[in-house]
Amino acid sequence: MRLLRFYPGRNRFVYTWHDCQARSGLRPFHHQMEKKRMATQTVYQFKITLKGIRPPIWRRFQVHSDITFYELHRIIQEVMGWYDGHLHLFELGGMIITDGETLAEVWEDGVDEQRTRLPQFIRQAGQKLRYEYDFGDGWEHELLLEKILPAEAGVHYPRCLKGKRACPPEDCGGVWGYAGLLEAMADKSHSEREMYLEWLGDEVDPEAFDLAEINETLQEM
């Protein structure tokens, strides 16, 4: 059964999947399968950094190594604080990995992210790839595979370990637009400050980072 949940703290809807049968007689079976998976599973530890902004905005997080690039995209959206309202892509060694619709329209020789698992292209610690979100604003991220680790028993993946600074607001004009926004918000006499306040609905704290809130959302994935 597919359920649509609304999380007031994030002001957004999140799709989650629940197997209703697993809540009854099949729960022990699914629990055993998960234990078996954990026994052989490895974990990828990534550090993602938003490029072009200082001090840097970054997150360190861990995922099961066998997830698809689409699942990685969804996790990145959550740990960074984006709202998944725009196109995106991964680039590794000149290879484009993105959703099937974008491939059909733009990159015919690319790779479908929903049919491609991480180990098909990412196998060694130290590998880097580019993740771009919102082709208009052009938010570019560097994604570094820091470590390959055994999964820990009793730990939910994905999980965020650490991070710094808040994600910029959506549709603010990219790196330069965000710099202008922060400049206006820091100066109460700035001519554009009221416009930004009306648009955003609140003050912007560029240093904000709530690890607990991020992991609470990841628990639903």
Q: What is the role of each PLM region?
A:
Residues 2-8:
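Extreme N-terminal basic, low-complexity initiation segments
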Residues 13-21, 25-221:
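Short linear regulatory motifs enriched in tryptophan with gly/pro/ser
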